[in-house]
Amino acid sequence: MSTAYYLSKLSERRRSVAVMVGDVGVGGDHPIVVQSMTNTDTADIDATVMQVSALWRAGSQLVRITVDRDEAAAAVPKIRERLERLGIFVPLVGDFHYIGHKLLVQHPACAQALAKYRINPGNVGFGAKKDLQFSQIIEIACQYNKPIRIGVNWGSLDEALLTQLMDENAQQEKPLSMAEVMREAVIQSALHSAFAAEKMGLGRDKIILSAKVSDVQDLIAVYTLLAKRSDHALHVGLTEAGMGTKGVVASSAALGILLQQGIGDTIRISLTPEPGGDRTREVKVCQELLQVMGFRQFVPVVAACPGCGRTTSTVFQTLAQKIEANLCKNMPIWREKYPGIERLKVAVMGCIVNGPGESKHADIGISLPGTGELPAAPVFIEGKKVKVLRGHHIAEEFEEILSDYIRTRFGQHEQKRA
C-alpha cells in the first residue's frame, strides 16, 4: 500500500461503505485511491507484467487489465505470479465485457487471482440473457469473496433501460431534456445493478459504483445525483477525456469539483497516450490533482515563480527543475529512508519581489538574484535566513544544503535504528 501522507479531512468526505480490494481500502475512512489501467494485450504476459510494474512504481494502487478472451484469462494467474516474484502485490482488477460470465467460470484460476471484477451493465448480456449472465458473475464474486465495480458508461448504456426512460419521459406534462434522461439512465443502471447484486447475496461492502460520461458538466451532474442516492463507494473518472493538455484539463476540472464536494473514493484520469508515450502519466496527474487540492501528499512540493522581466536569467528555472527531478527520482527509496519527506516544501525563487517571502514560507528556500540585483542568494530554513550564497556555484551549494537538511530533519529514525 502507498505510504503517502494523507491530508484529507474525513469529516468533509461523503460517507461511503468501505470496500477492501486486496489490501487496498476504498471508501469509508480510507484515503482516496489512485488507479490506472494497462493498454497491453493481457495475453502478452511479458508486456503486461512490465506495464503493471511501471504503473505500480509510479504510484497506482490498483491496476485494471483487460480480460476479453480465453488467452487473456489464462494469462492472469501467470501475471499475478510473475508480479509477486518481483515483489509487486498491487491488486489486479479484471475488466470484463460481453463474456465475463463465461471466462470466470471456465478459468477459476483467473477468478481467484483477480482482486476485483469490473462489470458493465450495458453489455453483460442482452435480452433474456442479461439477468442470467449478470447473476453468474455475482455468484462467482460471492464464491471467491471478491468485490465488484459496477461500471456504467454512457457509450455502452443499457439501450432497453434508456428506451424505457425516454418513453416514460415523453408522456410527462413537462418532459426532461435528452441530457437529463441520459443522466438518469446512467444513474439507474448503476443503482439497479447494485440492488440486484445485493439481492443475490453480495454485500454492500463488496460493491463499488461508477457512472462515467465524457462531458464535464454531465459528469458533475451524474455523480452529484448518484452520491445523494447511494452510499456505495464511488470510482470517479471522465471517460474518453482525450489527449494531452485537453485531457488533463477536462479531467482535472470535473474531478476537482467533485472531490471538493467530498465525492470520490477512487479516481482514474483516463488519458489517451501519444504513440509511444508514457502510460504512467495518468497516474502522476492523479497524484498531482490530489496533492494540489490537499487531499493527499505524494512528493515534496517545489514552489517556483513563473518568471517575468525581472528574471531574464534561467538559473532559477534550471535549479527548480533539477531539484524536482532529483526529489522524484529518489522518492521510492526516501519514502522508506526518510518518513515524512513527502511533506517537504522547497522554494526556488527568481528575484527579490516574492523570493524572500516565499522562501520563508517553505521549509527550505532560496531567493536567487533577479536582473540588476546584487549577485547574492539568501537561503532560508524554516523561516530564518541561514546563509547568503555568492559566486558561480550557487546552485550546487544550495543542493548540498538541501541534502543536509533532508538528512538532518527526516533521517532521525535512521540514526535510532543504527
From Swiss-Prot:
PANTHER family: 4-HYDROXY-3-METHYLBUT-2-EN-1-YL DIPHOSPHATE SYNTHASE (PTHR30454), 4-HYDROXY-3-METHYLBUT-2-EN-1-YL DIPHOSPHATE SYNTHASE (FERREDOXIN), CHLOROPLASTIC (PTHR30454:SF0). Binds 1 [4Fe-4S] cluster. It comes from Bartonella bacilliformis (strain ATCC 35685 / KC583 / Herrer 020/F12,63). One of its GO terms (biological process) is terpenoid biosynthetic process. Belongs to the IspG family. Pathway: Isoprenoid biosynthesis; isopentenyl diphosphate biosynthesis via DXP pathway; isopentenyl diphosphate from 1-deoxy-D-xylulose 5-phosphate: step 5/6. This is 4-hydroxy-3-methylbut-2-en-1-yl diphosphate synthase (flavodoxin). [4Fe-4S] cluster binds at residues 305, 308, 351, 358. It holds the Pfam family GcpE. It comes from the Bacteria. InterPro entries: Dihydropteroate_synth-like_sf, IspG_bac, IspG_bac-typ, NO2/SO3_Rdtase_4Fe4S_sf. Its cofactor is [4Fe-4S] cluster. The keyword Iron-sulfur applies. Its EC number is 1.17.7.3. GO terms for molecular function: 4 iron, 4 sulfur cluster binding; 4-hydroxy-3-methylbut-2-en-1-yl diphosphate synthase activity (ferredoxin); 4-hydroxy-3-methylbut-2-enyl-diphosphate synthase activity (flavodoxin); iron ion binding. It catalyses: (2E)-4-hydroxy-3-methylbut-2-enyl diphosphate + oxidized [flavodoxin] + H2O + 2 H(+) = 2-C-methyl-D-erythritol 2,4-cyclic diphosphate + reduced [flavodoxin]. Keywords: 4Fe-4S, Iron, Iron-sulfur, Isoprene biosynthesis, Metal-binding, Oxidoreductase.
